[in-house]
Amino acid sequence: MAENQYYGTGRRKSSTARVFIKAGSGKIVINQRSLEQYFGRPTARMVVRQPLELVEMTEKLDLYITVNGGGISGQAGAIRHGITRALMQYDETLRSELRKAGFVTRDARKVERKKVGLHKARKRPQYSKR
């Protein structure tokens, strides 16, 4: 591992992201592809950049990310969580700012399981009084 490389693991829904940060020019590589190639949706790209824009380090750090599991939204959230954790390892003084923005807290919401006798997690069969 490089001497000044920082690491953070992020999770959201069923996605897991491993984020490596080092000083550089602002290059973001996700699963050997650029941010623009990996995420087609502008909202997902925005979510990924949020912690960097908050601490104004968009052009100062290079990010190497591997992410797997889940869909686009979950992966973007996992990457954001991972970047936040790596930034805190890089500079602990950023923690309060990132916490205020709500990036430090792991979003614990997951898909609710389907129950027996119901169509979905909460959708019940139609009720007939007579």
From Swiss-Prot:
PROSITE patterns registered for this protein in UniProt: RIBOSOMAL_S9
Record flagged with keyword Ribonucleoprotein: yes
A Pfam family hit: Ribosomal_S9
Example of a GO cellular component annotation carried by this entry: cytosolic small ribosomal subunit
Any one GO molecular function term: structural constituent of ribosome
Keywords assigned by UniProt, alphabetized: Ribonucleoprotein, Ribosomal protein
Keyword Ribosomal protein: yes
Signal peptide start-end: none
NCBIfam families in the record: PRK00132.1
Protein name: Small ribosomal subunit protein uS9
Species of provenance: Aeromonas hydrophila subsp. hydrophila (strain ATCC 7966 / DSM 30187 / BCRC 13018 / CCUG 14551 / JCM 1027 / KCTC 2358 / NCIMB 9240 / NCTC 8049)
Gene name of this polypeptide: rpsI
